[in-house]
Amino acid sequence: MRHLLVVAALLAGAAPAAAQLMPNDQSLVTFNRYIAVRERRVPGFDSPGIPLGSFTLQPTLDANVLYNDNVLATQDDRDGDVIARITPALTANSNWSDSLLSLSAIADIDRYGRLGTENTVNTNLSAYGWHDLSRATRFRSLVRFQSLRESRESQDVFVLTRRPIRFRTLELGVGARHRFANTQVSVDGGVVKSDFDDAVRRSDNILIDQDFRDSVLKRGRARVEFGQSPAVAYFVQGTYDRRTYRLRARDPLASARESEIVEALGGVRFELPILARGEVGVGYTRGSYRGVQFTPVSGLAIRTQVTFFPTQLTNVTVSAERRVSDTGVPSSGGFATLSGSIRVDHELLRQLVLGASAGFRRDSFNGADRDDERFELGASADYRLNRHLSARLNLSRLDLTSSGTGAFKSFVANRLLFGVGVRP
């Protein structure tokens, strides 16, 4: 069941160019010694789903009321509004012994009290599956379609448009893994096609062409794990990305922004009796671009997340990452991100989970004199009334500072959310 929950969470993710195309396959080190607070299945509060033949259906409905004091993420003339957000979702997981098929449909429907131009509907349709050819060999595949609106707070925003920019992505992925005694080899690859709609500038109704962002991303990844014990495994991992743009034949800028990004990592995955589990990966990354105006970006690569369990009711999760990504900003080929965060979750009286988080992120853009620094703070409370009904309260603050001659905007946004969740 825990494996299915992880798959569902990954399939629900939405991003223009996801950092991870395929969900991670099962590692040599499976996390089963400790149970994180938000993973715990509490008797009497866990929804069993609806049996339907060889599938189990998990319909959900989340209804939230959100207040954002800076909806447009502007530096001056901040405009706040109340948003009603409805999120219906349906997941169907097969009950087969040697295979899994997981189908998912999710929609996020936002309706604003005053700023009707911000009303959005985001959809996510996906199908993920795996089949065990033998105890040692597994094949996997993924198909996902998303219709999304770009966040006003995205690092790719370079102009204030009348409505959030709409785009669609189609993702196809395949993967395989094989185990040899205490060694596991896994490979996967995929294609992501992105298509952006044009938008109108908010200040003067001038059409802003977005066709230069239409692209195809091809990704390949290979990973080898060496198991020292059921609780410790060392790994090496390599990832290769190649992005091409639809207008490259007739648009010099689109051709110049075509990129190749490589990443090589080595590290360890563990779940130890010292009350800690996680994965630490360190290595090298390099992004290169066709245009001579965009110099290569290279340096340290980091992908690390470790959870500590000081008590059975408290988790502390620490994350750090450094990577190179492509961007939608026309004056830049891409950007290097350095980020870190800490989150504390505490379970109180079985039904109430309290959380607090803090994070920092720095984006340094290639080809443009621009550095963005984001500081985020958050606090949350999730209350389980029974197996069918839950309630949540979230508070968050984002403080973004953009510097350099190519800086776009600096802003602060505070958000308050109250919501309820319904399960069958």
Which residues make up each language-model segment?
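Cleavable N-terminal signal peptides
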Residues: 6-7, 17
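Gram-negative and organellar
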Residues: 20-424
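Short, linear, compositionally biased motifs with a strong N-terminal bias
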Residues: 10-11
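Positively charged n-region of N-terminal signal peptides that target proteins for export
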Residues: 1-3
